[in-house]
Amino acid sequence: MIKFKLAAISAVLMLTLMYSCDYEFIEPPYIEPPQGLSFSEDIIPIFDASCNTSGCHVQGHFAVDLTPENAFSSLFAKDMIDVATPTESRLYVKLNDGNGTHSSRSTAEQRAYILQWIEEGALDN
């Protein structure tokens, strides 16, 4: 009888914990990027917020160094940008793969900014 009560209490506790830990991520509203994006003013802040933090894409760690002083040259040296077909740029594809941490670390708005910057010629401005 004691085992039954203990099992029942455990089951109720587990169900309570399972259903009380629900988190719904709310995606911020999409804002159309402005024309004439600047690499230093519009793209670098995206990398600073989500890519080159916690030792991810910093100098000496991963293939692409996205720190402000090295990001532009690293993106082109590692063939991450394709201005002829922007949606096939390795950077854009990586951000939209849906399988890894890359897509979860950026918003739809940030990905749209990066795509537009590539479409505008991926200038170092």
Q: What spans do the regions from the language model cover?
A:
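Sec-dependent bacterial lipoprotein signal peptides
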Residues: 1-21
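Aromatic- and Gly/Pro-enriched helix-to-coil junctions and flexible linker segments
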Residues: 21-125
